[in-house]
Amino acid sequence: MKAVVLALAVLFLTGSQARHFWQQDDPQSPWDRVKDFATVYVDAVKDSGRDYVSQFESSALGKQLNLHLLDNWDTLSNTVGRLREQLGPVTHEFWANLEKDTEWLRQEMNKDLEEVKVKVQPYLDDFQKKWQEEVERYREKVGPLGAELREGARQKLQELHEKLTPLGEDLRDRARVHVDALRTQLAPYSDQMRERLATRLAAIRDSPSLAVYHAKASEHLKTLSEKAKPALEDLRQGLMPVLENLKTTVLAAIDEASKKLNAQ
C-alpha cells in the first residue's frame, strides 16, 4: 500500500508536465496522462504486493509452510508483463481513435468557453479591483489598532477585539455586496453557457454523426476484444501452473500439519 500511495503522490505532486520537464518532450495530452496514471498505479500495486509476499515468506509461519509464494509471484508478474506488451498496441490504437473521433466536440466547447470568458473578464477584473480596495480600506483602519495593542499590551486586548469585530463584520458585509453584484452580472452568461451546452448536446444526440461515432466505438471495442482474446488465453495458460503448484504446496503443508497433530 505504501508503494501505491507513493506512486499516486509522485504522479499528482509532480504534475501533469513532469515528463515534459525532465525529458523535454512536448506536454502530454489528457489521454496520455490517463494512460500513464494507469501504468503507474498497476506497477505500484505489483511492487507493493511483492513486498507483502516477501515479508510473509520471511515470517516464522511463512518459513514453516514453505509455499514458495515469491517464485510464484515472479512467474505471475512475468506473465502479466507479457500480456501488457501484447495488448499495448491495441489499447494505444483504441485511445488514439477515441481522441480523434471526439476532437471536434472539444474544439467547439473550447470555442464557446473562450467566448464567454472574454465577455465576463471585465466583470471579474472589476470585482478584483473592488475587493482589493476593500481590503486596503480594512488594513488602513486596523493599522492604528495594532499600534494600540503594542502600546497597551494585554490590558487592551479585549478592547482591541471589540474594535476589530465591527470592522471585520463591515468587511464581510461589503464583500457580500460585491459578490452578489458579480453573481447578478454573470448570471446571464451562465445561463447562456448552459443553453449552448444543451444545444450542443441536443445537436450531437440528433446528429447522424452520433450514430457513426457509436458504430466506430463499437467497432473499436470489438477489435480490442478480439485482439485481447489470445493474450488473455496466454495469461490463463501461464497462471495454471502457478495455481496448481500453489494448490499442491498448500495441500502438502496441511497434510503434514495434520500428521503432526495426530502424532501428538
From Swiss-Prot:
InterPro entries named in the record: ApoA_E, Apolipoprotein_A1/A4/E
One GO MF term attached to the UniProt entry: phospholipid binding
Region (10 X approximate tandem repeats) location: 67-264
Predominant subcellular localization, coarse grouping: secreted
UniProt KW keywords: Cholesterol metabolism, Glycoprotein, HDL, Lipid metabolism, Lipid transport, Lipoprotein, Oxidation, Palmitate, Phosphoprotein, Repeat, Secreted, Signal, Steroid metabolism, Sterol metabolism, Transport
Each Sequence repeat, start to end: 67-88, 89-110, 111-121, 122-143, 144-165, 166-187, 188-207, 208-229, 230-240, 241-264
Post-translational modification: Glycosylated. Palmitoylated.
UniProt modified residues of type Methionine sulfoxide: M109
Signal peptide as annotated in the record: 1-18
Record carries keyword tRNA processing: no
Compartments reported by the entry: Secreted
Keyword GTP-binding: no
GO biological process: adrenal gland development; amyloid-beta formation; blood vessel endothelial cell migration; cellular response to lipoprotein particle stimulus; cholesterol biosynthetic process; cholesterol efflux; cholesterol homeostasis; cholesterol import
A single cellular component GO annotation: chylomicron
Subunit and partners: Homodimer. Interacts with APOA1BP and CLU. Component of a sperm activating protein complex (SPAP), consisting of APOA1, an immunoglobulin heavy chain, an immunoglobulin light chain and albumin. Interacts with NDRG1. Interacts with SCGB3A2. Interacts with NAXE and YJEFN3.
Annotated family: Belongs to the apolipoprotein A1/A4/E family.
Described purpose of this protein according to its UniProt entry: Participates in the reverse transport of cholesterol from tissues to the liver for excretion by promoting cholesterol efflux from tissues and by acting as a cofactor for the lecithin cholesterol acyltransferase (LCAT). As part of the SPAP complex, activates spermatozoa motility.
Protein name: Apolipoprotein A-I
Organism this protein belongs to: Jaculus jaculus
